[in-house]
Amino acid sequence: MTTALDQLKQYTTVVADTGDFQQLAQYKPQDATTNPSLILKAVQKDAYRPILEKTVRDHAGESVGFIIDRLLIAFGTEILKLIPGRVSTEVDARLSFDTQRSIDKGREIIKLYEAAGVGRERVLIKLASTWEGIRAAEVLQREGIRCNMTLLFSLVQAAACAEAGAQLISPFVGRIYDWYRKQKGADWDEAQDGGANDPGVQSVRRIYTYYKHFGYRTEVMGASFRTTSQITELAGCDLLTISPELLQKLHDSTEAVARKLSPDEARDARLERVAIDESSFRFQLNDDAMATEKLAEGIRLFSADAVKLEKMIEALR
């Protein structure tokens, strides 16, 4: 029997969302994504501790920030040995509201990869989908540095990223689901509110339809999944980045997976283009309580994990 994972791959590029690169080979993903939380999780495992220790030892006299950048590249280069496509490496979330420093960090990461023998076409620079992050992506894209826009929770963020020419966006399914489920509390009914009605699934479907309708070339990669049903409801999306745990569940399942998203259907949709300038972007984002709260929370969480990683490095020096 064909597995659900193999069926999904007929419609969608499957990406592994992990820093635990030893798990990659069995699922044969095209690309891989990382973030500060995933790297922090990985270096706490015995299998990856030597990478952290070697990076700290090799750059003993350098700043913690310098060492973290080298650690990210160390993980990225190991991941690229196991996949045919691209790896996403994230800019420090504490730069989410600083356009110039985000640009500088993106350039620096690419230089480090190139010094390690990795071409820039195999790397995506992850930036938060703030106004400042989107402006940084606009500059980097013009320089041939491809960007993956993360912490994306709304159509206005997606529209702004497309207008800026970002290579790829990562709308977060699970975190949207979490917010609406918490809001409903005891009234949440998974049978009624999940599946095709899942707010996170609907958000990605809306963004995908908007992009294909207006002919944007920016890739849509659904991210942050809680269940396999969220994944299969988005079969046909350009890419889906999936944790090893959910990849395993899809691998173990033989449930039928049908295409749910189609560019042809999207082109026939009746839609209006979203107006994008700084003031309208900020107002529309502010008007969306879920997107505002989850964006702020995501930046805080990634920043906190960056601090934890810094403390781990300090303890080894």
UniProtKB/Swiss-Prot annotation:
Matches recorded under SUPFAM superfamilies: Aldolase (SSF51569)
Record GO cellular component, one term: cytoplasm
Localisation per UniProt entry: Cytoplasm
Name the UniProt record assigns to this protein: Transaldolase
Root EC class: transferase
Residues in coiled coil: none
Subunit structure: Homodimer.
Role this protein plays: Transaldolase is important for the balance of metabolites in the pentose-phosphate pathway.
Gene Ontology terms for molecular function: transaldolase activity
Organism: Burkholderia mallei (strain ATCC 23344)
Annotated family: Belongs to the transaldolase family. Type 1 subfamily.
Keyword Cytoplasm: yes
Keywords: Cytoplasm, Pentose shunt, Schiff base, Transferase
InterPro entries: Aldolase_TIM, TAL/FSA, Transaldolase_1, Transaldolase_AS
Functional pathway: Carbohydrate degradation; pentose phosphate pathway; D-glyceraldehyde 3-phosphate and beta-D-fructose 6-phosphate from D-ribose 5-phosphate and D-xylulose 5-phosphate (non-oxidative stage): step 2/3
